């Protein structure tokens, strides 16, 4: 009962916060946990000290903040997934624009210990096509949502060195809709009723939809070293979190070509074979979704009172997301192979402090795609290598109050084709772009 109530509470918080349903970072990872750091393409994230997002990126950097402070903000996202098939048909997997919320609290307990709490949406995605679009066997729609509650402690070991550690309680929900080819199974079912009749069937498919959720745990750790007063180096790590999600699975809308098979109708086919073998009907669904581990190294150099330079390198363990397996009533219904590889992000950025209250920033980043073999690219996660181009600004209205606004354009490059299960090219994404707008406020008590 307590677990169910907690799931409802976390779900309500995430929905009320206008959860993200857009995939744009590599895989379905959401880098966007700070609207301020977005303005420099997340270069220096965690060690920059300009906001409280170090709670997420590197908890050791909480020692940069005195007293108590809070931060709230969001990053709004719009997609352009422009697809054209080999036959000239077009589609666009853009979902309605959504917002990724984030919130942080940092409190200095004493001269050596800090406490921080992060509320983030670290993984999420959402793509949606028409039910009858040409690539429906690659996916019709998909939404993955995570909400992460992350308490942390930081310890200042010396004037130059600090460490941080935290735990994550993470709620995840997944809704996946896909049309699955079951031609061989239907041929077998029909031949079992009327021998030889199934040989005339050239195509058969059903629509599968699973809606499942889960709660799981993880941990994170970080370190920061300041060899010089104006130079900070940080490394951090977040563990993978495996969600064994359970919920409802519905398989319906059987489509058979040709539609007429002698004296047989679809009702006979469904009732005789498909339902008994877990290929049709409503059942208990289960899916395993892995939020991968990642490690990050960042540097911040305050060159002078006017300029600060930043850099970040991040590795993400996407090779752990080898396949997406969906079960119904304990039987495997579908397995979607991913064969993903680890990804890397490198970014460089700069802050320019024009006045005591106005700072401009900009950054550029390159991020690799987890898709090792383009034949495993799906329309629901149509990933590709991408460039980030970002700029932003901070406004310090008083010693206690600051606002940040940032914009970024993510542009997908290189191979963007879609293939069928026989290895033939079905089409390509002419554009894989995302547009991000972030706004946040920081208040110090």
Can you describe what each PLM-predicted range is?
Residues 1-24:
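Gram-negative bacterial Sec-dependent N-terminal signal peptides
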Residues 10, 31, 35-38, 50, ...:
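N-terminal amphipathic/basic helix or basic patch
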Residues 24-41, 45, 87-90, 97-445:
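Outer-membrane beta-barrel porins/channels
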């Amino acid at each position: 009962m307590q677990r169910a109530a907690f799931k409802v509470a976390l779900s309500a918080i995430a929905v009320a916060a206008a959860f993200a349903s857009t995939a744009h970072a590599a895989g379905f990872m959401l880098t966007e946990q700070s609207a301020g750091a977005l303005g420099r393409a997340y270069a220096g994230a965690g060690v920059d000290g300009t906001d409280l997002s170090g709670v997420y990126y590197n908890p050791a950097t909480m020692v940069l903040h005195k007293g108590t402070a809070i931060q709230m903000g969001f990053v709004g996202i719009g997609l352009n997934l422009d697809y054209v098939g080999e036959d000239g048909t077009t589609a666009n997997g853009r979902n309605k624009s959504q917002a990724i919320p984030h919130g942080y609290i940092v409190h200095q307990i004493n001269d050596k210990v800090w406490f921080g709490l992060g509320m983030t949406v670290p993984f999420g995605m959402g793509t949606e096509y028409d039910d009858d679009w040409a690539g429906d066997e690659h996916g019709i729609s998909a939404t993955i949502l995570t909400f992460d509650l992350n308490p942390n402690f930081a310890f200042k070991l010396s004037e130059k060195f600090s460490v941080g550690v935290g735990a994550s309680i993470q709620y995840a929900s997944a809704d996946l809709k896909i049309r699955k080819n079951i031609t061989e199974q239907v041929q077998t079912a029909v031949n079992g009723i009327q021998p030889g009749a199934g040989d005339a069937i050239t195509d058969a498919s059903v629509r599968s939809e699973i809606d499942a959720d889960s709660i799981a745990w993880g941990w994170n750790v970080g370190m920061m070293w300041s060899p010089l007063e104006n130079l900070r180096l940080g490394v951090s790590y977040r563990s993978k979190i495996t969600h064994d999600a359970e919920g409802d699975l519905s398989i319906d809308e059987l489509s058979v070509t040709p539609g007429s098979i002698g004296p047989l109708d679809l009702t006979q086919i469904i009732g005789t074979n498909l339902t008994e073998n877990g290929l049709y009907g409503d059942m208990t669904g289960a899916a395993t979704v892995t939020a991968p581990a990642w490690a990050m190294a960042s540097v911040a150099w305050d060159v002078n009172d006017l300029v600060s330079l930043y850099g970040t390198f991040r590795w993400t363990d996407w090779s752990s997301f080898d396949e997406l397996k969906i079960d119904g009533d304990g039987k495997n219904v579908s397995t979607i192979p991913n064969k993903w590889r680890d990804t890397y992000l490198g970014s460089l950025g700069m802050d320019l402090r024009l006045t005591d209250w106005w700072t401009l920033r900009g950054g550029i980043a390159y991020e690799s795609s987890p898709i090792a073999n383009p034949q495993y690219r799906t329309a629901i996660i149509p990933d590709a290598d991408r460039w980030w181009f970002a700029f932003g600004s901070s406004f310090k209205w008083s010693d206690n109050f600051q606002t940040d606004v940032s914009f970024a354009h993510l542009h997908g490059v290189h191979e963007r084709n879609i293939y069928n299960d026989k290895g033939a090219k079905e089409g390509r994404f002419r554009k894989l772009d995302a547009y991000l707008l972030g706004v946040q406020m920081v208040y110090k008590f």
